[in-house]
């Protein structure tokens, strides 16, 4: 009997062990989503390896982590908390994506979902470029999200420091540069970097100190338009990029930017696509709105007006994604602007180089003149003025703007009364 009970006990114990052993493990909860994409050459469609990718939180404009690089298949992948993000990509021999003066497009990453964001890049026009690397520190603390600019006589090349403070500036022409870091609340020491072609200039480490205390304030005057609240920012004069942390929205048509580092800036109002632009005649009369800060408070007012609406080719107002055109001779179209005597069109590349139209230095004269009865013109139309500086090139990104001019008794016999938005008219030639 004892043997039977013993066998029953062993059988029950074995059954319990079997049940416990077969119990499924609790699934690990999913806490992130995946951002993934393939980076390719925009012309050949071939995969690009070793592309530096920095992911930014769209709400704070700060990097989310260390830099990542694309693999030999051009693929990059990052695990992220659910939220809104944007990316910037750079590689030696290729232009940055997006270009420095174009705002990136944000997107959402959802829990447990793979978000695909492919990137196309075109070859750099810099033929003798090297690259600069370094780290940005404030004492023993890495400084993330600082704008790093290498400047030589007004020619600037830039990048953003990642979460570990590391940075790389690609495609820097051979020369000697002054390298600084820019971030609200911090002042930077300057380092020198001598660049040679196809070579890394390493160790350009930058020390920053907290305590930047300058302020820039001002009021917005609205001309020929109703009052709305607009964005105001301080940008780097060499690259046109907004200094991280130095942008705001007006309140009752007044703005204030605090914690401004010492240095010179180009102030900018109403850069967003909101139907409002800085008054071009105000800029001609007063000059570009530069401000030099060395602690203290600087007053910088602005005048703004209604913008001219561009039609085609152009990105939509809600996006800065350039549209693709299938010709190197596109026709530009816009809506008429009241009280205009004539229009001036201006076509620039992604780096701000004038390709066609625009004005001579300091708006002294117009390179093209389009009669007020016309609201379209083909690229390079010789009947309206000077020929293009160069032809449009397949695979490159361009921006076109149109100015409204009015005849009057002012010096030169005319003044500008409006212009199209900074972030409209973006297109890529197929």
Regions inferred by a protein language model and the residue ranges of each:
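Sec-dependent bacterial lipoprotein signal peptides
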Residues: 1-20
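Long luminal/extracellular ectodomains of secretory-pathway precursor proteins
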Residues: 20-430
């Amino acid at each position: 009997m004892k043997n039977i009970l013993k066998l029953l006990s062993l059988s029950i114990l074995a059954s319990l062990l079997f049940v416990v052993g077969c119990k499924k493990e609790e699934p690990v909860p999913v806490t992130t989503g995946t951002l993934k994409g393939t980076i390719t050459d925009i012309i050949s469609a071939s995969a690009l390896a070793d592309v530096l990718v920095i992911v930014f939180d769209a709400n704070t404009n700060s990097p989310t982590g260390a830099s990542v690089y694309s693999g030999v298949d051009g693929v990059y992948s990052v695990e992220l908390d659910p939220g809104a993000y944007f990316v910037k990509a750079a590689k030696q021999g290729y232009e940055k994506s997006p270009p420095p003066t174009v705002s990136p497009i944000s997107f959402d990453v959802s829990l447990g979902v793979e978000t695909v964001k492919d990137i196309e890049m075109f070859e750099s026009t810099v033929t003798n470029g090297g690259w600069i690397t370094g780290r940005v520190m404030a004492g023993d603390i890495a400084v993330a999200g600082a704008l790093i600019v290498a400047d030589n006589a007004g020619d600037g090349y830039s990048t953003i420091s990642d979460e570990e403070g590391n940075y790389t500036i690609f495609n820097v022409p051979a020369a000697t540069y002054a390298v600084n870091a820019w971030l609200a609340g911090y002042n930077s020491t300057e380092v020198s970097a001598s660049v040679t072609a196809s070579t890394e200039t390493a160790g350009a480490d930058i020390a920053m100190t907290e305590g930047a205390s300058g302020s820039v304030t001002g009021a917005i005057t609205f001309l020929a338009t109703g009052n709305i609240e607009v964005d105001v920012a301080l940008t780097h004069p060499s690259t046109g990029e907004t200094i991280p942390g130095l942008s705001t929205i007006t309140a009752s048509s007044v703005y204030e930017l605090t914690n401004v580092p010492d240095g010179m800036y180009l102030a900018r109002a109403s850069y967003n696509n909101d139907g409002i632009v800085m008054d071009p005649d105000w800029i001609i009369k007063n000059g570009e709105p530069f401000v030099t800060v060395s602690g203290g408070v600087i007053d910088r007012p602005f005048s703004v007006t209604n913008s001219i609406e561009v039609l085609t080719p152009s990105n939509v107002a809600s996006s800065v994604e350039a549209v693709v055109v299938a010709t190197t001779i596109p026709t530009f179209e816009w809506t008429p602007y009241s009280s205009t005597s004539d229009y001036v069109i201006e076509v620039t590349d992604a780096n701000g180089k004038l390709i066609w139209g625009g004005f001579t230095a300091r708006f002294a004269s117009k390179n093209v003149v389009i009669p007020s009865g016309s609201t379209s013109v083909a690229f390079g139309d010789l009947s309206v003025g000077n020929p293009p500086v160069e032809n449009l090139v397949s695979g490159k990104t361009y921006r076109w703007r149109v100015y409204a001019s009015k005849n009057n008794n002012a010096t030169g016999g005319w003044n500008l009364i409006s212009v199209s938005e900074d972030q409209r008219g973006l297109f890529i030639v197929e």
